[in-house]
Design a protein with these regions (language model features):
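AMP-forming adenylation/ATP pyrophosphatase catalytic core
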Residues: 122-128, 133-385
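ATP-dependent adenylation/nucleotidyltransferase module used to activate substrates
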Residues: 1-161, 188, 262
Length: 385
């Protein structure tokens, strides 16, 4: 029997309405404010302090207790340090995914259940589970599945792809079946006008109002290297560090008339392979020929088809992935036949692309996409059909 629910209160409208809905359902609700970062902005005002003031105002209005927990050390060690380490190797990780995995659905989960004796946790994420928004369909002997939110424009399941089965079994997502404008209406009806009108936070919490590259440069020293043209193999300029650019991003090369884009980054040589988006017939045929590949699954040869104004090296209709994380378990269809029809996404809000997944080994998958995608990077998510 679920009675006590710990709600992550951020000071925003989504978590406020989450707490309001839970209280109206009759749960004993406790608000938990997570302090993950304490840097001050340009005015000397700590953004966390302002958010905490709003969180306290919300809980006073709803007549529920609010407890602040300090995860600054944990965030530094398990999110920020990991982020910096990966940037130094040339990989561009997603801090929201790291935070959800290691802090919100790990440390917060442990504190809520073990220190505050909560039966479940709840957040203002736009997501659903097979157990229902209030765990009303909870079954002890059944795995829970993460499901997309009703509001596809706000769906946040992409950022929740690394959370564990054990945590998800005790998670409530009351906003999973609501549209964003309805959530704001509920907030106003609940007397939370101040929060309903609050500007939505879209940035990374530790960056503030600064440009991300200016921020990251405080922690990673510049390390100049060469831009190498993929077609010619010649140097076309110098960069200040592979951490400053990601796959598919336009290169910062001064003096040239052509636009170059990052194809790949080599940490060992500190070079960035770049491609130009202006192709003539000769080098286009050469590049496309290099991008032929043998599909070992059905012994056919495929060629990537792309718009001639964009370099085909940036596009791919297949990938091989490893370090797979199944939230529930490996699908029975994949276990039995080695093939799974599903959907693919590698960036938040990108449309789902149909794909076929082939099992190579216990920890490796070959994914064939129905259409070529540009600049695929690490961190892909597959969704059931």
């Amino acid at each position: 029997m679920i009675k006590n629910v710990a709600v992550g209160i951020s000071g925003g409208v989504d978590s406020a309405v989450t707490a309001f809905l839970l209280k109206n359902k009759g749960f004993n609700v406790t608000g938990i404010f997570m302090k993950n970062w304490d840097i001050r902005d340009e005015t000397g005002k700590c953004a966390v302090e302002k958010d905490y003031e709003d969180a306290r105002w919300i809980c006073n209005k709803l007549k529920i207790p609010l407890i602040q927990v300090d995860f600054v050390k944990e965030y530094w060690n398990e999110v920020f340090s990991d982020l910096i380490e990966k940037y130094q190797t040339g990989y561009t990780p997603n801090p929201d995914i790291l935070c959800n995995k290691n802090i919100k659905f790990n440390k917060f989960f442990d504190v809520a259940l073990n220190r505050f004796q909560a039966d479940a946790i709840a957040t203002g994420h736009y997501a659903n589970t097979s157990f229902g928004p209030y765990l009303e369909n909870y079954k002890e002997d059944t795995n829970v599945h993460l499901l997309q939110a009703h509001d596809s424009s706000k769906d946040q399941t992409f950022f929740l792809n690394q959370i564990s089965q054990e945590t998800l079994r005790h998670c409530m997502f009351p906003l999973g079946n609501y549209l964003k404008n309805h959530v704001k209406t509920i907030a106003k009806e609940a007397g939370l006008h101040k929060i309903a009108q609050k500007k939505e936070s879209m940035g990374i919490c530790f960056v503030g109002k600064r440009e991300f590259q200016d921020f990251i440069s405080e922690y990673i020293d510049d390390k100049p290297g060469e831009y190498i043209d993929l077609d010619s193999g010649l140097s076309i300029g110098k960069h200040n560090g592979i951490h400053k650019l990601t796959i598919g991003q336009r290169c910062r090369i001064g003096g040239g008339s052509k636009a170059y884009y990052v194809f790949n980054k080599d940490q060992k040589t500190n070079t960035i392979l770049a491609v130009c988006n202006i192709l003539n017939e000769k080098n286009q045929d050469f590049i496309v020929d290099k991008l032929k590949f043998l599909n070992h699954m059905n012994n056919t040869v495929s060629i990537i088809q792309v718009d001639s104004t964009i370099h085909p090296a940036l596009y791919s209709d297949f990938l091989i992935t490893q370090d797979i994380h199944w939230i529930s378990e490996e699908p029975r269809e994949l276990r039995c036949s080695g093939v799974l029809d599903c959907n693919f996404r590698f960036q938040h809000r990108n449309p789902l692309i149909t794909c076929n997944v082939y099992k190579i080994s216990d920890n490796r998958l070959f994914i064939r996409l129905s259409v070529p995608l540009r600049a695929i990077t690490k961190g892909q998510v597959i969704y059931g059909t």
